[in-house]
């Protein structure tokens, strides 16, 4: 009983920590999970990251366990993950890994895939591993469905689905900044993030992303000039992704080199694009 599945990374439009309402968009970076089940009544689960063998596999192991518990089976399992989403970069690597792990395990069992169940078990696993503050329903849904999702994270409801109407590129900056998750400081900007969220609900995703990035980078002591540098180089919008340290900049194809050159002085960059091709079983 084997199955492989993939799920997307995502970039932030609105970080939900301040208000409980958030938005994210799928990007063409993925994590793949390969699951093999053994019917031996032992329920021994072993995981490994192919790209980073020293990375603790506790999240994906928890995902497999929660799926097996849900379907009341006591199989053992091996799970391996691989992909091109940097860990702890603000690009929803945890959401992508948990979605892919849950989906691959359900596929290996031969059970019918139900999107709500996949998301619930993936988020449950992330909570249990203390990898999320809000449940990251916006990140999880953008990773799973692709495109843009606008969500009430507290109630796990998608308020709106959309996609970028233009053919744009995504420049991801991954600077060597110390990650800072100060929830109290993020709560202080709640009233101002609500203004950015209103822009998001109106469909003005570029302004929402930029405003959100300025607010959260200020709260978390990341440089806000990076986003302005990206605009100066031709980006449509730019901002902090998640709680950082990554930034995302959106631009037209003809501007991607200028934008990348403006950003790469701060750290490594990756050029990708928005994706509407969400999570799926490969085989």
Swiss-Prot record:
Transmembrane residue ranges: none
Name the keywords, alphabetized. Amino-acid biosynthesis, Aromatic amino acid biosynthesis, ATP-binding, Cytoplasm, Kinase, Nucleotide-binding, Transferase
Q: Which InterPro entries match?
A: GHMP_kinase_C_dom, GHMP_kinase_C_sf, GHMP_kinase_N_dom, Ribosomal_Su5_D2-typ_SF, Ribsml_uS5_D2-typ_fold_subgr, SK_arc
Per its record, the protein catalyses: shikimate + ATP = 3-phosphoshikimate + ADP + H(+)
| Presence of the UniProt keyword Protein biosynthesis in the record | no
GO BP term (any one): chorismate biosynthetic process
Cellular component aspect of the GO annotation: cytoplasm
Of which family is this protein a member? Belongs to the GHMP kinase family. Archaeal shikimate kinase subfamily.
Q: What is this protein called?
A: Shikimate kinase
Name the lineage: Archaea, Methanobacteriati, Methanobacteriota, Methanomada group, Methanococci
Q: Which gene encodes it?
A: aroK
């Amino acid at each position: 009983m084997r199955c492989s599945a993939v799920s997307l990374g995502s970039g932030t439009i609105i970080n939900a920590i301040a208000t409980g309402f958030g938005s994210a968009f799928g990007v063409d970076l993925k994590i793949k999970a390969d699951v093999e089940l053994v019917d031996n009544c032992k329920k021994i689960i072993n995981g490994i990251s192919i790209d980073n063998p020293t990375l603790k596999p506790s999240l994906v192991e928890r995902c497999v366990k929660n799926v097996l518990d849900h379907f009341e089976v006591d199989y053992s399992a091996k799970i391996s993950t691989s992909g091109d989403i940097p860990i702890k970069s603000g690009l929803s690597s945890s959401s992508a890994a948990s979605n892919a792990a849950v989906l691959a395990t359900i596929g290996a069992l031969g059970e019918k895939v139900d999107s709500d169940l996949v998301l619930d078990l993936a988020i449950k696993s992330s909570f249990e591993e203390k990898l999320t503050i809000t449940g990251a329903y916006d990140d999880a849904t953008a990773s799973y469905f692709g495109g843009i999702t606008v969500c009430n994270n507290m109630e796990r409801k998608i308020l709106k689905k959309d996609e970028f109407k233009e053919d744009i590129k995504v420049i991801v900056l991954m600077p060597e900044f110390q990650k800072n998750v100060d929830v109290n400081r993020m709560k202080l900007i709640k009233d101002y993030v609500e203004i950015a969220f209103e822009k998001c609900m109106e469909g003005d995703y570029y302004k929402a992303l930029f405003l959100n990035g300025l607010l959260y980078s200020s709260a978390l002591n990341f440089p806000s000039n990076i986003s302005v540098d990206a605009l100066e180089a031709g980006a449509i919008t730019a901002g902090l992704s998640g709680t950082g340290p990554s930034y995302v900049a959106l631009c037209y194809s003809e501007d991607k080199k200028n934008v990348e050159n403006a950003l790469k002085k701060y750290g490594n960059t990756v050029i990708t694009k928005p994706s509407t091709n969400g999570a799926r079983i490969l085989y």
